UniProtKB/Swiss-Prot annotation:
PROSITE patterns: ATP_CONE (PS51161). It comes from Acinetobacter baumannii (strain ATCC 17978 / DSM 105126 / CIP 53.77 / LMG 1025 / NCDC KC755 / 5377). Pfam families: ATP-cone, Zn_ribbon_NrdR. Negatively regulates transcription of bacterial ribonucleotide reductase nrd genes and operons by binding to NrdR-boxes. This is Transcriptional repressor NrdR. Transmembrane segments: none annotated.
Length: 152
């Protein structure tokens, strides 16, 4: 770690503590050259897998796109912002736990559907109607029947 005072390349760690609810490490350092002390914060970087679209294209995971999809499905539903954030984090965790560099968009869609099913059935059907490209009322009916069978 370069010293912010003299730009020397070497410093020693005097103290380390967890910060930001355990998501960061706060380190107190001392420059070996000039003796000045400074603080650094270290945090981990979460790398999400790339998404393989149904057309075969490969693109980076887009948290904003996932958030928009959830918000659209949950629009005007009795769900708090905290619940939405929890579901969003849970979905991303499930995707990371797959341990793959590339994940099919279909797999992500299935994870989202499972999460919405547990959270709000109306949002689940809304998402399913777009995700599975419902073409008529009968498709809605079949989805609702499947949902009711899962509950019993």
């Amino acid at each position: 770690m370069h010293c912010p005072f003299c730009n020397a390349a070497d410093s020693k760690v005097i103290d380390s503590r967890l910060a930001a609810e355990g998501c960061q490490i706060r380190r107190r350092r001392e420059c070996v050259s000039c003796g000045e002390r400074f603080t650094t914060f270290e945090s981990y970087e979460v790398v999400m897998p790339r998404v393989i679209k149904s057309n075969g294209k490969n693109e980076p995971f887009d948290e904003a796109k996932l958030r928009r999809s959830l918000m659209h499905a949950l629009q005007k539903r009795p769900v708090t912002q905290e619940q939405i954030e929890t579901v969003l984090s849970d979905i991303q965790l499930q995707i990371r736990r797959l341990g793959e560099r590339d994940v099919k968009s279909r797999t992500i869609g299935e994870i989202v559907m499972q999460s919405l099913f547990a959270l709000d059935h109306v949002a689940y059907v809304r998402f399913a109607s777009v995700y599975q490209d419902f073409q008529d009322v009968e498709a809605f009916r079949r989805q609702i029947e499947q949902m009711q069978q899962r509950e019993h």
